Amino acid sequence: MSLVVVGINHRTAPVEVRERVVFEPARIPEALQQLRSLPDVQETVIVSTCNRTELYCVAENLGQAELGEWLQRYHGLGVPLHHSLYHHDEDKAVSHAFSVASGLDSMVLGEPQILGQLKDAYRLAQEAGTTGPVLNRLFQSAFSVAKRVRTETKIGANAVSVASAAVAMARTVFASFDNRTALLVG
């Protein structure tokens, strides 16, 4: 059995593509079961946020092509996703999970929301009965690594969200926000 992660994120695809592969929270348990029903798939976790969708699987002979095709079929897309997907196996999959949990793979370096999103995704997979010893160990380790990164580095000292980064940038343009109006799009 091999650990594999296939995903799409803010670096590999524009928002127009990413939003088409977001999983509705209420449908994730069903999606987890469908994903696990693929041949030789033993364990699954689906991480789905505004900036990334990732499929973590423990399986035999399963790669980017099969998972990409499943993602495309599940969302009813007529266009292949292979040009927007990334794929990591074994040690690289572990390293990737640690980077994601720590906020090192986020649009804004060090943003803390992703850790909570990973915990939610893992909890949903546990409730759906699609985790097992490999993904349990991976996600528990990723949570520990993320906590250690946050406590032993200054990664969260600066802007920790796109909104706080935008406010910081606006402060360089305007001396004061008094009598200013802002329009938020997105």
Give the ranges of each region predicted by the language model:
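Hydrophobic Val/Ile/Leu positions in short beta-strands of Rossmann-like dinucleotide-binding domains
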Residues: 182-184
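A glycine-rich (often HGG/GG-containing) alpha/beta subdomain
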Residues: 1-106
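Glycine/serine-rich phosphate-binding loop and adjoining beta1-alpha1 elements at the start
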Residues: 80-180
